[in-house]
UniProtKB/Swiss-Prot annotation:
Organism, scientific name: Bartonella bacilliformis (strain ATCC 35685 / KC583 / Herrer 020/F12,63)
Protein purpose: Methyltransferase required for the conversion of demethylmenaquinol (DMKH2) to menaquinol (MKH2) and the conversion of 2-polyprenyl-6-methoxy-1,4-benzoquinol (DDMQH2) to 2-polyprenyl-3-methyl-6-methoxy-1,4-benzoquinol (DMQH2).
Binding site for S-adenosyl-L-methionine: T83, D104, N132, A133
GO annotation terms (biological process): aerobic respiration; menaquinone biosynthetic process; methylation
Pathway involvement of the protein, from the record: Quinol/quinone metabolism; menaquinone biosynthesis; menaquinol from 1,4-dihydroxy-2-naphthoate: step 2/2; Cofactor biosynthesis; ubiquinone biosynthesis
Gene name, Swiss-Prot/TrEMBL: ubiE
Reaction equations catalysed: a 2-demethylmenaquinol + S-adenosyl-L-methionine = a menaquinol + S-adenosyl-L-homocysteine + H(+); a 2-methoxy-6-(all-trans-polyprenyl)benzene-1,4-diol + S-adenosyl-L-methionine = a 5-methoxy-2-methyl-3-(all-trans-polyprenyl)benzene-1,4-diol + S-adenosyl-L-homocysteine + H(+)
Domain of life: Bacteria
Protein name: Ubiquinone/menaquinone biosynthesis C-methyltransferase UbiE
Pfam families: Ubie_methyltran
Family listed: Belongs to the class I-like SAM-binding methyltransferase superfamily. MenG/UbiE family.
EC number: 2.1.1.163, 2.1.1.201
Length: 260
């Protein structure tokens, strides 16, 4: 079952997945919020655990593929990017010529990002916005690029988030999504499962005092659509020239699309 599978629950409402657990659709966002409130201060460390530290290399590849220009007025929105990690990389790559909007539904994550922006001298180049990826508070054709890293699998309605991404991009705009994916190497998948389901929750308890949050994050990765299926979803949202690159045996994949 993919993250977009829906069933009718016992209360009559539609169901969605929270990791491996089926819940009423209306519950998912608040439950996901709870997870990220609890891990906000340790979010980058969490990604180190989930990716064995490789997320930093993957993010650098994401920025290289985006190739943000050193042009004043070039605007990017980074969705589910509360801690600012992707936005900071984009601003540095553009020599602080670009302007970034960091959008996240979770104020704890945004607070971490705001503090880091001040520390790194990047606050003048970033707006932090608390809002929902499914209902972006921006006009049509507002941005030159849309990025999202390790966030879209936590959105209750992925199709709505993709439609909103298409709407707010200018013609010629770029969509890039970095996400944990479906491991394709026979031995690596077994080793990664062992790491994910046995080691990660224990490390989550040790580092953040919250094994359940880390268990959800692992399960949410397994529930996310496979690379080809997600590419089809991007295409259905209206994007052209849709493609993806696998990283590290497909532990993660970087998806790209253009608004033509």
């Amino acid at each position: 079952m993919t993250a977009e599978t829906k069933r009718v629950g016992a209360t009559g409402g539609m169901e969605n997945s929270f990791g491996f657990t089926q819940i009423d659709e209306a519950q998912k966002q608040s439950m996901v919020d709870g997870v990220f409130h609890s891990v906000a201060e340790n979010y980058d460390r969490m990604n180190d655990i989930l990716s064995l530290g490789l997320h930093r290399i993957w993010k650098n590849s994401m920025i290289t593929w985006l190739a943000p220009p050193a042009i004043s007025g070039w605007k990017v929105i980074d969705v589910a990017g509360g801690t600012g990690d992707i936005a900071f990389r984009i601003l540095n790559a553009s020599r602080k010529k670009a302007h970034a909007t960091v959008l996240d539904i979770n104020h704890s994550m945004l607070n971490v990002g705001k503090k880091r922006a001040q520390i790194n001298g990047l606050a003048p180049f970033i707006d932090f916005v608390e809002a929902n990826a499914e209902q972006l508070p921006f006009s049509d054709q507002s941005f030159d690029a849309y990025t999202i890293a390790f966030g879209i699998r936590n959105v209750p309605h992925i199709d709505k988030a993709l439609s909103e991404a298409f709407r707010v991009l200018k013609p010629g705009g770029r969509f890039l999504c970095l996400e944990f994916s479906n491991v394709e190497m026979p031995l690596l998948d077994k080793l990664y499962d062992l790491w994910s389901f046995h080691a990660i929750p224990k490390l989550g308890q040790l580092i953040a005092g919250n094994s359940d949050a880390y268990r959800y994050l692992v399960e949410s990765i397994r529930m996310f659509p496979k690379q080809d299926d997600f590419a089809c979803m991007i295409n259905r949202a209206g994007f052209s020239r849709v493609s993806y690159r696998n990283f590290t045996g497909a532990i993660a994949a970087l998806h790209s699309g253009w608004k033509i």
